[in-house]
């Protein structure tokens, strides 16, 4: 006996679909995973097989490869074959469904969905924190969907791993990666296209508001990975408030739309002394950790890189204790370009 779940571009059958469980239930499921450990802070730390996004295993489904120059592609026929392979696998699995919105502005919130094996409930819990959940209807119709099977190999692809992207139908199928970044990126990649179609510019940027004598000013913060984008976004000088950590839409006229109700933060070298806000959010019971070194007594060593420097944590914005709702942020006043590393040439030199 199977259950059925239908979406705009898929019909799935599974042994069960657990739809929109609570955070408490998701955390409990994550703690049952064999590669999960509880920490002394009351949250969960999962060690994954894959510790970063798999760009070499990412392919766009198209019959016009020239239209996607610079990107690896697969044919529509091959995408359908992969879909059939994944659908057959799901038929024997217990799945979790997480519904929500990318963004929270009534004019620009995009209905989104993650469908993933219950065996990897930490990813479901992490995505649930990042989606905006207010006002999700019972008949939720996602514009973007990620169907995620971390335990299904994709034979013949790099590392037997595949992220198959169907831009036309807002659908991403992920096979054989247990890294949360594929869930996050799967939705945001589709959202980027929606922003462009609406005349905006999607930006990999933080956003914060800073009080001044002339009123609050809105800053966008851009920089390559490792230059301090998250750190700069969450610093509290002058009572500034973070709006968004990772992706925003910049619209004509300077209006900013946010994407996520939380943060997927790097934890390597995280210091309570120098980054107290992020440290506090990471070390509280509702956060999820990924690939962070953990001592035998359940404490965390953010400076230990014996497994990876790409340790991560997901936490909700409310864990910060203070933030600015993107709907209330003004139009953009300043753009900050970070170039902390000596080997990085800034995008704008003068």
Where are these regions (language model features)?
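Conserved glycine(s) of the Walker
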Residues: 227-230
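Short alpha-helical segments and helix-capping/turn motifs at coil-helix boundaries
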Residues: 79-88, 129-132, 158, 312-325
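Charged, amphipathic alpha-helical linker segments immediately N-terminal to NTP-binding catalytic cores
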Residues: 137-197, 202
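Glycine- and acidic
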Residues: 67-71, 168-176, 216-218
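Catalytic cores of large soluble enzymes that bind and process phosphate-bearing ligands
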Residues: 70-78, 175-183, 327
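Glycine-rich, often acidic-flanked micro-motifs
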Residues: 1-55, 196, 204-224, 234-240, ...
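N-terminal accessory targeting/assembly segments
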Residues: 1-132
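Extended, Lys/Arg-enriched charged tracts that mediate electrostatic binding to polyanionic substrates
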Residues: 106-150, 301-311
